[in-house]
Amino acid sequence: MIKRYEACFLFKSEEIEYKCSLEEVRKSLEFFGAIDIVSNFIGERALEYPIKKQARGRYEIIEFSMEGNNLKELESRLKLIKNLLRYMILVKIVRKINTKKIKRRNFREFRDNVDKESFKGGSKIETPTGSESTDIQEK
C-alpha cells in the first residue's frame, strides 16, 4: 500500500557537500520507488550540541509517497550517505475534515459575538393586536 511520508534531513553545512548529499538522497528515494517528491529547504542553523563534530547544519524537509515495504531498505541506504548527519521519516496522516462540525462551530461563534447591546436600546418588539393576528391566519 502506498503511504505518504514526510522526512527531515540534517546535512553538513558546507554548500558543495550539502548539494551532493541532497542529490544522493533524491536518487535513493527514486530508486526505491518514491513518487510525488516535494523538497523544502528550511535553512542553516547552529546545532545545540555537536553531531559528528559539526556545529552547524542544513535542514531539508522532503515529502514523498512510497510503498511501505521499501522503507527498511531506504533507511539502510540513507545510513551510508557520508554527509547526512541525521534523518527522521514519519508517516503523514491525511484526515478527513468534518465540515458539519466546523459550520456549527462557526455559527455558534457568530451567534455569541453578536452585539447584544444593540438589541436592548433599539426598538422594542411589538406583539400583534387581535385584528392583526386574524389577518395573518387568513393569509
From Swiss-Prot:
Residues 126-139 have a biased composition (Polar residues). Belongs to the bacterial ribosomal protein bS6 family. The gene is rpsF. GO terms for biological process: translation. GO terms for molecular function: rRNA binding; structural constituent of ribosome. Pfam families: Ribosomal_S6. One of its GO terms (cellular component) is ribosome. Keywords: Ribonucleoprotein, Ribosomal protein, RNA-binding, rRNA-binding. Residues 118-139 are annotated as: Disordered. Disulfide bonds: none annotated. Binds together with bS18 to 16S ribosomal RNA. This is Small ribosomal subunit protein bS6.
